[in-house]
Amino acid sequence: AQKNRTDYIRRALERGKYVISDTPMTLNPEEMEELFALAREHRVVLVEKLTLVYLRAFTQLVWLTHGALVGDVVAVKCAVSQDDFEGGKNFNETVSQALCACIKLLGKDYLEVNTNAVKCSDGEFIYDMITVKYPRALATIEIGTTVDVENELVIIGSKGRITVPNDWWNTGYFEAKVEGQEFLKRYSFNFEGNGLRYLLQELMIM
């Protein structure tokens, strides 16, 4: 299926079509560069459907985090039940959203990535814990299939924490507990549909 996706993208670009692809487009970095070069050659737009990054609430979350709302970020914890994620996407599609969230919050200058997959007796993948180590922070990504994983995104800072409950990949609400403040800060934004409309809005102004 992954190979078919890449082939479909290549053929569409060669025909001068704009392409919005499920993520990941390909698992090969060189192939990814080739596809973007092909898009430039044919003067069309190629984007991955990482709708999370186009949501107003998530953009605000990143802005507040980088603005030290909860101080220096020391950890980002991202958990997702694969069955709850858009009807049960495959592992690569699920982990792409989680990695995107971590990189938007902590940046691209990580030191190492480790994965710890757990399989059941018949060899089927049931759980994975991925750790991404940064110079002064740690990101953990927890993905479960048949095991109970509570969907949430938590940002732990030196002066508090921010929590995005439930289906954080459709961020519409988050709350912050800031050191020295008695009450939670709550942030709520309208969210409609599956997020695709927000990506399309961005494409309209490209």
PLM segments and residue spans:
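C-terminal helical cap and adjacent loop that interface with cofactors, partners, or active-site loops
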Residues: 182-206
